[in-house]
Amino acid sequence: MEKMLLKSTTRHVRIFTAEVVDEELKFHPNKLTLDLDPDNEFIWNEDSLNKINEKFNELIKERAGKDLDDYELRKIGSEIEGLIKFLLQNGQLSYNPDCRVMNYSMGLPKTNEVL
């Protein structure tokens, strides 16, 4: 029986047991592909992207030798979501005012002014 492509989807993180070939996802049992912020809700800089990629690689290494089932993928996705929120709360990431829908899914931006 051929294995199926697994995925974990959160609001800002999508993880697939696949690799990108000719702009298409192709199942691969030993590779994960990260699709970060598919709705462009945030403005990303190199530093914040590097932190996300480092954390993603760290989480994968921690699971070396384990089956990458949907539960493990969800745990990885949840940890990446937590890092996104941390970066946002610490001013290392900001909301994109040009995104399709401005809903502040990770909380209202912090300002010095009283709302």
UniProtKB/Swiss-Prot annotation:
Catalytic activity, EC: 7.1.1.-
MF-aspect GO terms: oxidoreductase activity, acting on NAD(P)H, quinone or similar compound as acceptor; quinone binding
Superkingdom of the organism of origin: Bacteria
Keyword hit for NADP: yes
Chief place of localization: membrane
Keywords from the named record: Membrane, NAD, NADP, Plastoquinone, Quinone, Thylakoid, Translocase, Transport
One CC-aspect GO term: plasma membrane-derived thylakoid membrane
Reactions performed catalytically: a plastoquinone + NADH + (n+1) H(+)(in) = a plastoquinol + NAD(+) + n H(+)(out); a plastoquinone + NADPH + (n+1) H(+)(in) = a plastoquinol + NADP(+) + n H(+)(out)
Methyltransferase recorded as keyword: no
Subcellular location: Cellular thylakoid membrane
InterPro entries: NdhM (IPR018922)
Membrane topology: Peripheral membrane protein
EC category: translocase
Job description of the protein: NDH-1 shuttles electrons from an unknown electron donor, via FMN and iron-sulfur (Fe-S) centers, to quinones in the respiratory and/or the photosynthetic chain. The immediate electron acceptor for the enzyme in this species is believed to be plastoquinone. Couples the redox reaction to proton translocation, and thus conserves the redox energy in a proton gradient. Cyanobacterial NDH-1 also plays a role in inorganic carbon-concentration.
HAMAP family noted in UniProt: NDH1_NDH1M (MF_01352)
UniProt subunit comment: NDH-1 can be composed of about 15 different subunits; different subcomplexes with different compositions have been identified which probably have different functions.
Similarity field: Belongs to the complex I NdhM subunit family.
Protein name per UniProt: NAD(P)H-quinone oxidoreductase subunit M
Native source species: Prochlorococcus marinus (strain AS9601)
Gene of this entry: ndhM
